Amino acid sequence: MTEQHQPNLELDFAAHTNDWGEEPNLVAEPALDQAVEVQTQPVAERQRQITAKIQILQPVEQVWQVLTDYEALASFIPNLAKSRRLEHPTGGIRLEQVGTQRLLRFNFSARVVLDLEEKFPHEINFNMVEGDFKAFSGSWLLKPSLAEQAGTHLCYSVRVWPKLTMPVAIIERRLSSDMRLNLLAIRQRVEQLFATAS
């Protein structure tokens, strides 16, 4: 962890907006932007719980496959510069991720190390063990759709406690935007990989 880093506001999956580094190909259509439901809730002073949800028209197992291909995440998640597995002291799953983005005409980056717990095929919990936040934890929840067509309700929830170097209002706004874009990128990736197979 280095002092010159500013929180990237999205530990593992980063974000957009014009002056901040927009990814226009994923938000060109307002209908896409509305496909993601985002809720923000203060949980303590300078701490926020942010939850984003999306419907993906592919089975849970295929969404799980995309989420758990950890080393490939940087190839399709906006502004995620690096995602790689590290050796875990007890044999679990540990990731190092580096996000970069342009914020107010400056480039910022953040490095985090996450420990993950997988509960196949419905839940992935993560907790930051080292990085540029005071605390960052959350989960991915995958539930099968009850509709006739196979589908997945994907829910991404994070609890963030930023360091004092970044105003919490900016982080809240950034994370909400980031999470929306990340879920759209995941849905797009799942559809690219599996739509022709179904």
Put a short name on every predicted segment:
Residues 51-54, 83-85, 110-116, 137-144:
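Hydrophobic/aromatic beta-strand elements that line small-molecule binding cavities or substrate pockets
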Residues 2-91:
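Hydrophobic ligand-binding cavity/cleft-lining segments
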Residues 3, 127-177:
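Beta-strand/loop substructures that line and gate deep hydrophobic ligand-binding cavities in soluble
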Residues 4, 43-46, 84-130, 185-197:
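Glycine-rich portal/gate segments that line the openings of hydrophobic small-molecule binding cavities
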